[in-house]
């Protein structure tokens, strides 16, 4: 692992919507990697490919996002320090000191290092260098609603066999559900092999959890392959106390390499299924009436319930459905839920 190159990347400012410097830096880096072809689209997303496939092969694809939430400053000073061994969200479980990276401004004040998701970017670049056949995607403006990945070049995905995103904190997280999208089937060869590889690479038992939103959920809607999001070594994200565990980044790189060794250049299909959030009182009706392969989760809230939008928007019974929320969810008053349920049910029957 080239620590100097990692620190160089971390020093490039990349606040959301101000990512030009980072994109230029990445294109310069890609120019120097032998055997790699790349391009950027009109959104400034960057796509890179290495190696030529044989008949029946598919590329593994690794992705991350180029933006951070931190205020853009002229110069980010990255320093190596030692902290107690971190666990997710900065909690410690022993007194062992480990090497970490932290960021400061030129006045010596702590600032966000942007490990979310510069760790992911660095890991993707390292895998591009070390693997023979691979694709990577680096997407802009994830932090404000996955704007880059939602408008990605779908043609780039057509020969991809599975997708891995590096955009979870710590060293023991795997995202199964993201933005109302299930990324993989737990009862599958893909997950069985991936879980074993990631667990061995990090040396931790992995926690399979839900992630609020990130780019892989947008790609999953566009391609019917298994996807996953995993930890990549940043802690205390979105704060000036953010730091990066160097060892965890190394483990994440090894996890990616080992995934490709074990999974190979195969396609691991998994059909996109929306997850519908409904009041518990009508959740059973959804399951019984639809008899479809749709995941249904229910929960109660005092004022509002949450339902995922299903691509088509219309007016019916005085209810206007729109994609006003960037994360793909609507907030619907209780009194509208009964008639809304009929609309959703009708759509799902047509769609599936």
Where are the predicted features?
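Active-site metal-coordination/substrate-binding segment of hydrolases
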Residues: 57-133, 143
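Zn-dependent metallopeptidase/amidohydrolase metal-coordination segment
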Residues: 207-252
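A non-catalytic alpha/beta surface segment that caps or lines the substrate-entry region
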Residues: 5-8, 12-56
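An extended, acidic, His-containing surface patch that forms the Zn2+-binding/catalytic region
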Residues: 178-223, 272-275, 296
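Short glycine/proline-enriched coil/turn segments at helix->beta-strand junctions
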Residues: 2, 31-35, 42, 55-59, ...
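His/Asp/Glu-rich mid-to-C-terminal helical/loop segments that flank catalytic regions of hydrolases
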Residues: 236-292
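Positively charged, low-complexity terminal tracts
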Residues: 287-352
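Acidic/histidine-rich catalytic neighborhood of metal-dependent amide-processing enzymes
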Residues: 109-186, 208, 216
């Amino acid at each position: 692992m080239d620590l100097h190159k990692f620190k160089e990347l971390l020093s490039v400012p990349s606040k959301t919507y101000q990512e030009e410097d980072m994109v230029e830096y990445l294109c310069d880096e890609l120019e120097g990697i032998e055997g790699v072809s790349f391009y950027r689209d009109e959104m400034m997303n960057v796509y890179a490919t290495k190696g030529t496939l044989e008949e029946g092969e598919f590329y593994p694809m690794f992705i991350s996002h180029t933006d951070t939430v931190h205020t853009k400053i002229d110069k980010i000073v990255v320093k190596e320090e030692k902290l107690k061994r971190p666990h997710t969200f900065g909690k410690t479980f022993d007194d062992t000191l480990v090497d970490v990276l932290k960021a400061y401004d030129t006045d010596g004040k702590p600032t966000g290092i942007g490990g979310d998701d510069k760790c992911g970017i660095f890991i993707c670049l390292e895998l591009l260098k070390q693997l023979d056949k691979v694709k990577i995607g680096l997407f802009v403006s994830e932090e404000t609603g996955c704007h880059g990945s939602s408008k990605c070049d779908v043609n780039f995905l057509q020969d991809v066999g599975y997708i891995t995103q590096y955009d979870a904190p710590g060293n023991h997280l795997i995202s199964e559900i993201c933005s109302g999208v299930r990324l993989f089937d737990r009862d599958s060869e893909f997950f069985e092999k991936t879980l074993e590889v990631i667990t061995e690479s990090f040396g931790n038992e992995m926690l399979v959890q839900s992630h609020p939103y990130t780019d892989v959920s947008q790609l999953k809607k566009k391609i019917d392959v298994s996807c996953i999001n995993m930890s990549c070594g940043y802690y205390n994200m979105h704060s000036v106390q953010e730091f990066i565990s160097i060892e965890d980044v190394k483990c994440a790189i090894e996890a990616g390499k080992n995934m490709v060794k074990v999974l190979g250049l195969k396609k691991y299909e998994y059909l996109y299924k929306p997850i519908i959030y409904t009041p518990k009182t009508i959740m059973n009706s959804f399951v019984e009436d639809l008899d479809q392969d749709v995941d249904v989760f229910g929960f109660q809230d005092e004022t509002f319930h949450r339902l995922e939008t299903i691509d088509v928007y219309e007016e019916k019974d005085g209810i206007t459905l729109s994609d006003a929320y960037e994360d793909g969810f609507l907030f619907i008053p209780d009194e509208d839920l009964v008639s809304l349920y009929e609309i959703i049910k009708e759509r799902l029957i047509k769609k599936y």
